């Protein structure tokens, strides 16, 4: 019954999101129409803008409207929409929402430190399910929003830990990204980015991670509050890296649990993604941490189900379907380059110190 309710609520979020801000072609045929559209967009998204900024922002908005409009006229497997980022330049968008320069942090931290083992290596590709969706299995919490803090690495880490914890304990618990932002600072850099594998090892060495309720997200670099560690803890036993540049290996991992992945999200098509299988422009300059929570196919195109952390109004209720099995070994947007997942051996967690675990289902 709970799973049916979860699927219904997820479908409702997708429907509500799809019915968001829209426009008529006539509104973009004149300067006056575009100006009215911009004011309507600002009201819809409650975007605060000073009068002094309006002309500059309107110019950016006009450019983005035409990009969305012209892209949607083409016969592509995905669509764009005017979301909350519509009056940001691509550079402003990248600086604010894709600030985790994975390559930079990889150079600072050196080679990967995960186990050289890959526990799913033995899996037979031909026997894997044709599609997997961990949302429908109740292993994914509701979509979260990192805001203008470059903490995507923390959200990616937490999504993977929430998933394996549900799989092992049958309890879905929303965990604290802010604890990682504030406390995992020896090598990761809070709102200035980080690496998911480092965060997994922090959680292991720290004895676990606390809940979202105990240590709520603030979207800023704060001082580590050790007292908030006294709440419920979810533990892991380490992590493993998925063999890089190998989408088949990634498929084996995602078939078994949600996986942290890094991607290049710094394109206008990604900025305004709305629905469908994303085959748009993106490179391999990894700048954003997300989570692969499933895979499938649509009209003959294979895709990854990727959970983002930009709120439910972006994409398909906060998710994007990224094309799967392309010619390049790195995968679309570099999705196969930096994948890792947490290991959890036990089917239980430490006894709660303050009340019971809150099951999100």
Swiss-Prot record:
Find motif (Prevents secretion from ER) and give its ranges: 358-361
Q: Which GO terms describe its biological process?
A: proteolysis
Residues carrying sugar: 75, 124
The EC number on file is 3.4.22.-
Q: List the disulfide bonds.
A: 149-191, 183-224, 282-333
Matching InterPro entries, A to Z? Papain-like_cys_pep_sf, Pept_asp_AS, Pept_cys_AS, Pept_his_AS, Peptidase_C1A, Peptidase_C1A_C, Peptidase_C1A_papain-like, Prot_inhib_I29
Q: In which tissues is it expressed?
A: Expressed in roots, stems, rosette and cauline leaves, flowers, buds and green siliques. Found in the tip of young primary leaves, in very young root tips and at later stages in all tissues of lateral root, including the vascular bundle. Not expressed in lateral root primordia, while directly emerging through the epidermis.
User: What residues make up the propeptide removed on maturation?
Assistant: 21-127
Signal peptide segment: 1-20
Is the Phosphoprotein keyword given for this protein?
Answer: no
Its predominant location is endoplasmic reticulum
Entry's localization field = Endoplasmic reticulum
The entry's active site is 152, 288, 308
Q: What SUPFAM superfamilies does the annotation carry?
A: Cysteine proteinases
| Gene Ontology molecular function: any one | cysteine-type peptidase activity
Q: Name one GO cellular component term.
A: endoplasmic reticulum
Q: State the UniProt keywords alphabetically.
A: Disulfide bond, Endoplasmic reticulum, Glycoprotein, Hydrolase, Protease, Signal, Thiol protease, Zymogen
Q: Kindly give the SMART domains that the UniProt entry links to this protein.
A: Inhibitor_I29, Pept_C1
The entry's function note states: Involved in the final stage of developmental programmed cell death and in intercalation of new cells. Cleaves extensins, thus probably supporting the final cell collapse.
Report the family membership. Answer: Belongs to the peptidase C1 family.
Q: What is this protein called?
A: KDEL-tailed cysteine endopeptidase CEP2
- Organism, per UniProt? Arabidopsis thaliana (Mouse-ear cress)
């Amino acid at each position: 019954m709970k799973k049916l309710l979860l699927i219904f609520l997820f479908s409702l979020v997708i429907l509500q999101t799809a019915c968001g801000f829209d426009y008529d072609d006539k509104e973009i045929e004149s300067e006056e129409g575009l100006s009215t559209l911009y004011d309507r967009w600002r009201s819809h998204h409650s975007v605060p803008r000073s009068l002094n900024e309006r002309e500059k922002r309107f110019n950016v908005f006009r450019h983005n409207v035409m990009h969305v409009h012209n892209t949607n006229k083409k016969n592509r497997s995905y669509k764009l929409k005017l979301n909350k980022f519509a009056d940001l330049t691509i550079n402003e968008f990248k600086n604010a929402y894709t600030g985790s320069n994975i390559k930079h942090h990889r150079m600072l931290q050196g080679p990967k430190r995960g186990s050289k083992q890959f526990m799913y290596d033995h899996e037979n590709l031909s026997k894997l399910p044709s599609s997997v969706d961990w949302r429908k299995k109740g292993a994914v919490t509701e979509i979260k929003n990192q805001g203008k803090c470059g903490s995507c690495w923390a959200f990616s880490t937490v999504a993977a830990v929430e998933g394996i914890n549900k799989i092992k304990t049958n309890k879905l618990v929303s965990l604290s990204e802010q604890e990682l932002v504030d406390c995992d600072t020896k090598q990761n850099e809070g709102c200035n980015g980080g690496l998911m594998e480092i965060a997994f090892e922090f959680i292991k060495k720290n004895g676990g991670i606390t809940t979202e309720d105990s240590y709520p997200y603030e979207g800023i670099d704060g001082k580590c509050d050790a007292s908030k560690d006294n709440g419920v803890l979810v533990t892991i036993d380490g992590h493993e890296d998925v063999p890089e540049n190998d989408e088949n290996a990634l498929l084996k991992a995602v078939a078994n649990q949600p996986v942290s992945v890094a991607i290049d999200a710094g394109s206008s098509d990604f900025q305004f993604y709305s629905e469908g299988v994303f085959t748009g422009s993106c490179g391999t300059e990894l700048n954003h941490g997300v989570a692969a929570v499933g895979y499938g196919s649509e009209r003959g195109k294979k895709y990854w189900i990727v959970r983002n952390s930009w709120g439910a109004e972006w994409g398909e209720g906060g998710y994007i379907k990224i094309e799967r099995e392309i010619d390049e070994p790195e995968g679309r947007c570099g999705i196969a380059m930096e994948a890792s997942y947490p290991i959890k051996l036990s089917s239980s967690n430490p006894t709660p110190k303050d009340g019971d675990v809150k099951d999100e289902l």
